[in-house]
Amino acid sequence: MDDVSIPIDEIYLPAKRRAEIDPARVEALAESILEEGLQVPISVRKGKGRYVLVAGLQRLEAMKALGEETVIAIVVGSPQH
């Protein structure tokens, strides 16, 4: 799987996941990203006209906090039903 750059505003975050945001962790990650760059891409899957976050909530929020417009992501397959 290749890493791709995705516009942050095209990534959907389900409401229940928003409750999992840890402001202290987001701040620490933002500082780390400023110093070293994003070391581990987030994971998303394709949804209807957008991407859905699979993994990397705190990293995504840190990128938003830094004012970034895009984020490096790995696009994974949809879950099997």
Feature map (PLM): residue ranges:
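A short acidic, often aromatic-flanked loop/helix-cap motif at beta-alpha or helix-coil junctions
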Residues: 79-81
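Short, charged/polar connector segments at secondary-structure boundaries
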Residues: 1-77
